[in-house]
């Protein structure tokens, strides 16, 4: 709710429901997530988000407004998570099958680490916004105890991996891994998150066009729609 670039974006409508509702309803079908938790800032203006989660039967944790590392750590501790799967609340088109794939990959690793298909990682080819990050609770706890930089407290992934520069923070401490995007939707040019008014207009049009035909529209449907825009 407190986004500086697009205030109130979590409640902006997509095909008649708030953006955050659309994010959550697309996560629910993921088979490899034991429990979905909406981690929100503990402030009066964000209580409406709890009502949306309640509508979908999803648990809520309210924590620090600005310290996301603390919010995630406290939520993971309360819900006794061995692994944390992070899906940003401004990505309205997550694909549950790709979330399941990155979780399966991560659970097969022999040591704690950070895995992501949330966006392109090391040339994986993923569109920005259909996957997830997963990391071990032990690494989140280490970050919670030792990270003091404000930017890293506000952006959890920067404790592990910098997407913009494709640079791991410390491979000796936290191995970084990904999976290859299936070739039929390997489109790293697609940005499917909502951070600006222009991106919201794009996503609103996408939902208006695709959701009534198929509420479970896939990334292949998105690509076909996107490529026919012009």
Predicted regions and their residues:
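Short, charged, surface-exposed loops that flank catalytic or proteolytic processing sites
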Residues: 150-155, 212-221
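N-proximal accessory regions
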Residues: 1-18, 58, 81, 99, ...
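Conserved core of the sugar-phosphate nucleotidyltransferase
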Residues: 94-190, 205, 227-230
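Short phosphate-binding loop-to-helix
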Residues: 42-107
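Short, conserved phosphate/pyrophosphate- and ester-handling motifs at nucleotide-, phospho-/glycolipid
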Residues: 196
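Short active-site loop/helix that positions an aromatic residue
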Residues: 200-209
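N-terminal glycine-rich phosphate-binding loop and ensuing alpha1 helix
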Residues: 1-40, 45
